[in-house]
Amino acid sequence: SEMCIRDRAKAVAGHDAVVSAYNPGWTVPDIHDQFLKGTRAIIDGTKAAGVRRLLVVGGAGSLFVAPGVQLVDTPQFPAEWKQGALAAREALNWIRTENTLDWTFLSPPILLQPGERTGQYRLGDEAPLMNGEQPGSISVADLAVAIVDELETPRHVQKRFTVAN
């Protein structure tokens, strides 16, 4: 709603960047719609505030595991995360059409877990990073390092990227 956009604009006005890791909660029955409404409000609020830099932390589901095949569309993708992952993919598709913001979309690796902050990670783009035959992983602390690094030294403006240790 217009009021929702104004509230978000007021919250971020005067800041250099907005980082969104919005998720209404994996157990929310209408996660798909809630995710998209929330993401749209964050994008619109960021624009209304005049903040140009937006970094969205999305999901791994939209990473390409083969030409034309995204992880969320594979039979192995967990059913309990599917609606949220489909919404995150839809949000990425919206953001890709956004030309007034200096946006970046960060897809975490397939495995995101607790762990130590090492400050070390590898960068990827449209495909998940792997450790041999195993899916790549990263600690939440190192994912935060990657977010701050991208904000301080932008390398993926109007692009999606992924990371893993």
Task: Specify the residue positions occupied by each region the protein language model found.
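Short, small-residue-biased leader/transition segments that mark boundaries at the very start
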Residues: M3-I5
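Mid/C-terminal beta-alpha module of Rossmann-like enzyme folds, strongest
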Residues: V51-R52, E126, M130-N165
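Catalytic helix-loop patch of NAD(P)-dependent Rossmann-fold dehydrogenases
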Residues: Q70-E98, L129-M130
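An anion/phosphate-binding loop that grips the pyrophosphate of nucleotide cofactors and donors
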Residues: H15
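NAD(P)-cofactor binding segment of oxidoreductase domains
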Residues: S20, W26-L54, L86, E90
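Conserved beta-loop-beta element that borders a ligand/cofactor-binding pocket
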Residues: N93-P114
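Conserved catalytic-site region of short-chain dehydrogenase/reductase
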Residues: T27, G61-A66, L111-G115
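Glycine/proline-rich active-site loop of Rossmann-fold NAD(P)-dependent oxidoreductases
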Residues: E98-N99, Q113-Y121, E150-K159
